[in-house]
């Protein structure tokens, strides 16, 4: 999760709603019940017609404690552990079952680095961006996507270098070669620094550099 614009006004608004209303959490709905998503609702035995993304979740901490929510979630986990696919998100949705305040997409703005994207649109619309799927901005495969710049810009500003995490050596090397041959290195702000870190990471036994 990366904050790209000042969210203060919206966060205050969300917590004001949580305080006034009888809800514990506020989230973005990811799936509504339809013929394509009904498996999720049936698997988790949900009665509601909406399933939220837990990547960005606002919590009324006082209500959470008062209602002993943590302990109840652990009990829910034990009851549905054989049905879980999306880990904590499934447990949370099974427990709250649609009982949450809706937040807009710009507060939990989904990005999938598998696909090209308009970073200007993201800068204009998003408050928090959420890197979904297995394509994370710290992997060699994904750094060539312009969308990874929101994460890597923070690393360059704070560490003065790209932040890369080791995955599988042959895959890292494959994507490094492919993206170089297709000139995607032109998307990089500091290509020499990236290649130095990437090669060190690929040929090192360390998990990250």
Predicted stretch roles:
Residues 5-12, 35-40, 67-73, 140-141:
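A short secondary-structure junction signal
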Residues 1-32, 58:
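GT-A fold catalytic core of metal-dependent nucleotide-sugar glycosyltransferases
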Residues 1-3, 27-38, 76-80, 102-108:
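Short linear motifs at secondary-structure transitions and domain/linker junctions
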Residues 1-12, 45-48, 79-83:
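N-terminal short leaders/motifs
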Residues 6-10, 36-41, 83-85, 108-114:
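Short amphipathic alpha-helical surface micro-motifs
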Residues 20-45, 135, 147-151, 174:
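A short, conserved beta-to-alpha structural element at the edge of catalytic cores
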Residues 18-19, 49-51:
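Solvent-exposed alpha-helices and their adjacent loops that cap or buttress functional pockets
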Residues 47, 54-209:
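A glycosyltransferase accessory/donor-loop signature
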């Amino acid at each position: 999760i990366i904050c790209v614009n000042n969210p203060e006004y919206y966060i205050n608004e969300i917590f004001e709603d949580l305080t006034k209303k009888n809800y514990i959490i506020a989230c973005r709905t990811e799936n509504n019940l339809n013929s394509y998503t009904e498996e999720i609702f049936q698997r988790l035995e949900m009665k509601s017609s909406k399933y939220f993304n837990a990547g960005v979740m606002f919590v009324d901490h006082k209500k959470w404690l008062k209602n002993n929510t943590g302990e109840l979630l652990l009990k829910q986990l034990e009851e549905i552990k054989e049905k879980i696919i999306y880990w904590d998100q499934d447990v949370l949705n099974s427990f709250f079952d649609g009982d949450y305040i809706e937040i807009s997409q710009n507060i939990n703005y989904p990005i999938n680095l598998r696909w090209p994207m308009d970073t200007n649109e993201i800068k204009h619309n998003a408050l928090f961006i959420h890197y979904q799927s297995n394509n994370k901005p710290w992997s060699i495969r994904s750094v060539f996507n312009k969308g990874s710049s929101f994460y890597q810009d923070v690393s360059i500003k704070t560490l003065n270098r790209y932040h890369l995490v080791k995955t599988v050596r042959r895959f890292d090397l494959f994507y490094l070669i492919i993206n170089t041959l297709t000139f995607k290195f032109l998307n990089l702000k500091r290509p020499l620094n990236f290649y130095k870190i990437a090669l060190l990471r690929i040929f090192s036994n360390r998990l990250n550099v």
